[in-house]
Amino acid sequence: DYITRGHSEHFQQWAEIDLKNVMRSSRNHPCIFQWSIGNEIEWTYPGNRSATGLFGNTDRNDKMDWTLWRTPVPPNSPEVVREFWRNYPRQTFSIGKTAAKLAKWSREMDTTRYVIANLILPTSSFETGYTDVLDIAGFSYKPAQYDYLREKYPNKIMMGTENVPRWYEWKACIERDYIAGVFLWTGVDYLGERRAQQWPQKATPEGPLDLAGFPRGSYYQFKSFWTDEPVIAIYTQTAKLSIFKKDADGNVVEKKKDYWKLAPRVWQNV
């Protein structure tokens, strides 16, 4: 049988039909308050990685500089990104034009909700026309750059649309009136996104609830943020996964100095 490479082979023919069918199925539900036209779509269009300066001017994921990823000021300014796209070879399909079609179809179906997308490389997306068609720019793991993006693009409504369930994500939101909220990815653990070296683990263990529905520490942490009820929860961490260790005198010390600042997912994973 023919081996498909996924929906991308059928997107041009079926995108409008699929999008509108999804909206018809749920648009009367009161929990729907906005429509997303894409999740981290920048990965699927060439040039976006190179434009950001985060990947050593390549389009290769293995070249990503994690230190630059977390810095408050991205390596490439809007002017540099703009110049990159001016000189980039024209492609058959562009992310900006595709987004414009999806946003147009969404508004043909519903003008009462905002159109949003989850951006993983926003410094590129703000210069490709992608964000021009959005009512709200959603960000994937970008609390460190909220202030920068607000400064450079002050007229765009912004919020977190993929955030790990950790205090630093919520703290970045409540300290900034211009960040409308966060979306925790994910509320419950799910099967998938595991790599070969993580076998036999098959689930992604990031949710406030595990696969069996049992709460993790992060569940109670966010409960304490979002309710007036007093909350106390005590959890432990294994010595192997902890960023702390005991020295020769039995004192608790960091395995790597100041590592807690660089690995917020690690020290709060309980």
Where do the model's predicted regions map?
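An active-site-proximal structural segment forming one wall of the substrate-binding cleft
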Residues: 11-34, 108
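Substrate-binding clefts and catalytic carboxylate motifs of secreted carbohydrate-active enzymes
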Residues: 33-36, 42-139, 144-270
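Beta-strand-loop-alpha-helix segment that lines the small-molecule cofactor/substrate pocket
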Residues: 1-4
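Polar helix-capping/helix-linker motif
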Residues: 7-8, 29, 176
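Flexible, glycine- and charge-enriched loops at secondary-structure boundaries
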Residues: 8-12, 92
